[in-house]
């Protein structure tokens, strides 16, 4: 029998104090920190808490803080039908109806749905189509396919087991049309776990005189306390999802492109966002359409390196062959000579023969690939996202007669267009910093690596002891929210099963290199003015000085990382 909204509000047995829907007080047992169960949310969203929920959100301020972000995301994709899978008290469902979207409102809490229904009537008389549904059985409880599914309000973190998370994402995926989009948000648990809790209390929980702060945090539990003006307190036990883990789960379910925003911004450098919003597209692209799947960070890097100013700078100032940090015998040594010495140092760490197949990720102008092919007679595949650099690479390679050994491919190292177990060596120099998802890059690297193969790369990194505010100018310049670190790469490579992970710390060369590039740029200023814009040169000099300062101050690390499958 179909339940009415009043039935949902009362629960199956109205008046039964054991019914979590009817109960006014939460129950967490003798030890609340042991409560780490997906189904327990029913005992947390009790009537007394739900009645105060809108005081926490403050619909008016929430509307102002979000602006048109979600509406713009949906309209840009031609969305007409939306499933609001975590409707709560109805804020987004009402907003979507106001904007003309055909919307179904689902939630696992009957009390929340009853509140949402009454809120819909109160706001311009909207009659919400509400469905009491458990995400793990969403196809059973909710019918039809949708252009978009939204799961907002940090709701996904109520799922405590990975099995539940994967099943829920699979249900979302199945209920989307072939070109549908999933939008999920979450607290920035990375920041809370790594550096402690802080909140601007601006975008999501904007109610005045209401606080939402952690009562306990560990790797498996985020217990938040909500305090209201009448001194009443309620708690929610949630799983602290890390951003990259969440992105990985969505990819593994089948979502093709995932963009992550911080507090509704594409880039979120120095100031940590309170919340992340993941926008995941289901539409499948062929290899010829990979450019459409590039993440925002990759698009930013591609546009930069394809620009005329950047191409002229790296070709005429940096050397036009290698675009990476060099190993200098003297601070005034030629950049090209020092840069090739880095290639030689790296090549000496692995056995290379004519039968060796090497993948060079972020190959730039192909200097390393040509050195390896010329010296060892091996085959090198260059993958790089800048079509401008790739064209120069092909022309120089052809001029040197090495085109039979070197293949140049346009692409992103976040989605490698190669089969599993394809390469003996995966090589990269100072490129991974441009990715917004380095965990994904490491997964792709290990996927295409042959058994007993080697991963060999350098990357400008944050030192393991660096504080994020020390990196602000560098991150802002690169439009990134973070850098990798030696500890990060060691952890990721270990997670992926690689062994004998070594880091040759050559950090002292990083400020020397950027200082040398700055000297060359300044000494050739008049000559370069004809083909590199003044604004670009000014910004570049500022950026180079920031690299030198941070390198000398110990906030940056650089060196050769070598790991074996």
Curated annotation (Swiss-Prot):
PANTHER family in alphabetical order: GLYCINE N-METHYLTRANSFERASE (PTHR16458:SF2)
Further comment: Functionality of the enzyme could be demonstrated only partially. When the complete gene was expressed in E.coli, little activity is detected and most of the protein is found in the cell pellet. Truncated versions of the protein were designed, encoding the GSMT and SDMT moieties separately: the SDMT was successfully expressed in soluble active form, but expression of the truncated GSMT was still not successful.
Any Gene Ontology biological process: one-carbon metabolic process
Catalyzed reactions: glycine + 2 S-adenosyl-L-methionine = N,N-dimethylglycine + 2 S-adenosyl-L-homocysteine + 2 H(+); sarcosine + 2 S-adenosyl-L-methionine = glycine betaine + 2 S-adenosyl-L-homocysteine + 2 H(+); glycine + S-adenosyl-L-methionine = sarcosine + S-adenosyl-L-homocysteine + H(+); sarcosine + S-adenosyl-L-methionine = N,N-dimethylglycine + S-adenosyl-L-homocysteine + H(+)
Highest taxon of source: Bacteria
Enzyme class of the recorded protein, top EC level: transferase
Organism: Actinopolyspora halophila
Full protein name: Glycine/sarcosine/dimethylglycine N-methyltransferase
Region (Disordered): 1-34
Record's keyword terms, sorted: Methyltransferase, S-adenosyl-L-methionine, Transferase
SUPFAM superfamilies: S-adenosyl-L-methionine-dependent methyltransferases
Free-text function comment from the UniProt entry: Catalyzes the methylation of glycine, sarcosine and dimethylglycine to sarcosine, dimethylglycine and betaine, respectively, with S-adenosylmethionine (AdoMet) acting as the methyl donor. Shows low level of activity on glycine when expressed in E.coli.
InterPro entries in the record: Gly/Sar_N_MeTrfase, Methyltransf_11, Methyltransf_25, SAM-dependent_MTases_sf
Record family assignment: Belongs to the class I-like SAM-binding methyltransferase superfamily. Glycine N-methyltransferase family.
UniProt binding sites for substrate: 154, 187, 226
GO MF annotations in UniProt: dimethylglycine N-methyltransferase activity; glycine binding; glycine N-methyltransferase activity; identical protein binding; S-adenosyl-L-methionine binding; sarcosine N-methyltransferase activity
CDD domains assigned: AdoMet_MTases (cd02440)
Transmembrane segments: none
GO cellular component terms attached to this protein's record: cytosol
């Amino acid at each position: 029998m179909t339940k009415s909204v009043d039935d949902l509000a009362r629960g199956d047995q109205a008046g039964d104090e054991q019914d979590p829907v009817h109960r006014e007080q939460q129950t967490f047992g003798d030890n609340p920190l042991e409560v780490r169960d997906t189904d327990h949310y029913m005992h947390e969203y009790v009537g007394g808490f739900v009645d105060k929920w809108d005081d926490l959100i403050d619909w008016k301020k929430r509307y102002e803080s979000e602006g048109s972000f979600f509406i713009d995301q949906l309209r840009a994709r031609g969305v007409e039908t939306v499933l609001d899978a975590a409707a709560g008290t109805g804020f987004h469902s009402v907003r979507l109806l106001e904007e003309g979207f055909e919307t179904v409102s689902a939630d696992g809490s009957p009390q929340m749905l009853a509140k949402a229904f009454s809120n819909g009537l109160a706001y311009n008389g909207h009659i919400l189509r509400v469905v009491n549904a458990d995400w793990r059985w969403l196809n059973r409880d909710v019918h039809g396919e949708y252009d978009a599914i939204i799961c907002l309000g940090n709701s996904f973190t109520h799922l405590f087991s990975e099995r539940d998370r994967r099943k829920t994402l699979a249900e979302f995926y199945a209920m989307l049309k072939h070109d549908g989009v999933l939008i999920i948000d979450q607290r920035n648990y990375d920041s809370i776990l790594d550096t402690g809790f802080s909140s601007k209390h601006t975008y999501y929980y904007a109610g005045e005189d209401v606080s939402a702060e952690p009562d306990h945090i560990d790797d498996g539990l985020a217990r938040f306390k909500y305090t209201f003006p009448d001194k009443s307190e309620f708690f929610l036990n949630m799983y602290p999802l890390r951003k990259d883990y969440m992105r990985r789960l969505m990819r593994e379910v089948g979502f093709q492109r995932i963009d992550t925003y911080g507090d509704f911004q594409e880039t979120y450098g120095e100031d940590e966002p309170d919340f992340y919003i993941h926008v995941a597209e289901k539409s499948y692209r062929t290899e010829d359409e990979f450019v459409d799947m590039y993440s925002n960070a990759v698009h930013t890097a591609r546009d930069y390196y394809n620009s005329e100013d950047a191409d002229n700078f790296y070709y005429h100032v940096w050397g036009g062959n290698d675009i990476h940090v060099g190993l200098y015998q003297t601070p005034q040594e030629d950049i090209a000579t020092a840069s090739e010495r880095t290639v030689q140092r790296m090549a000496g760490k692995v056995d290379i023969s004519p039968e060796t197949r090497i993948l060079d990720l972020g190959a730039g102008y192909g200097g390393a690939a040509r050195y390896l092919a010329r010296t060892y007679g091996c085959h090198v595949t260059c993958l790089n996202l800048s079509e401008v650099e790739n064209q120069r690479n092909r022309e120089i390679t052809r001029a040197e007669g090495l085109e039979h050994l070197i293949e140049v491919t346009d692409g992103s190292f976040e989605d490698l267009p190669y089969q599993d177990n394809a390469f003996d060596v995966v090589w990269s120099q100072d490129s991974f910093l441009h990715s917004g998802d380095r965990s994904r890059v490491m997964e792709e690297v290990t996927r295409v690596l042959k058994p007993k193969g080697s991963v060999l790369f350098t990357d400008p990194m944050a030192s393991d002891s660096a504080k994020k505010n020390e990196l602000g100018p560098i991150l802002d310049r690169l439009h990134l929210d973070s850098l990798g670190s030696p500890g990060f790469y060691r952890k990721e490579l270990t997670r992926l099963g690689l062994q004998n992970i070594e880091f040759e710390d050559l950090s002292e060369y990083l400020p020397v290199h950027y200082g040398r590039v700055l000297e060359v740029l300044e000494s050739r200023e008049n000559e370069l003015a004809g083909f590199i814009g003044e604004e670009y040169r000014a910004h570049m000099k500022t950026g180079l000085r920031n690299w030198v300062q941070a390198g000398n101050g110990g906030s940056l690390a650089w060196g050769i990382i070598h790991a074996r499958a």
